[in-house]
Amino acid sequence: MNAKEIMEDIARTRANFKKASRRLWDYLEEKIEFRDPLDPLTLGSDGEILLELAHIAARREMEAKTLADQLISSLKDERAEAVLRLRYMDGMSWELIVHFFEDIDQPVSMRHLYRVHAKALAQIDNFLAEMSAGA
């Protein structure tokens, strides 16, 4: 790969990340009824299973679909199911999903999502605002 190809690949990756971020945020807004941004909305034990699955999937992509399909069929929590479906319906990478929902010391919650990833969410909001202004 020469320098030009590498730069083109980086540009494509950035563009894909912006598109993926927008799809993730749109999907979450559609699937989760947002109230007060700091109101905890925990996924409970399903969220813990989801994070474990995401870790496995990030390391062993080939096994991830079977594991996800099994988990999706057994989940009772629609929010956890919605996050899993991002991977297979919208093509979202596990790494991006984990980026928004992962923390070792805290439960998965909207409070955590807003606090820990406020900068990333602000970038998504800015991108969506730019898209709306340009439309």
Question: What function would you assign to each model-found segment?
Answer:
Residues L75-L96:
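Short amphipathic alpha helix immediately N-terminal
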Residues A11, M62, A82-L84, H112-Y114:
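Short alpha-helical segments used as structural interaction elements across diverse proteins
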Residues F101-K119:
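Short, basic interhelical loop/turn and adjoining N-cap
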Residues M1-S74, L96, E102-P107, N126-A135:
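N-terminal interaction/assembly modules
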Residues T66, D77-E81, A118, A122:
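Generic detection of well-ordered alpha-helical segments
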Residues L113-M131:
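DNA major-groove recognition helices of helix-turn-helix
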Residues Y88-M92, D105, L121:
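Residue-level detector of secondary-structure transition/capping positions
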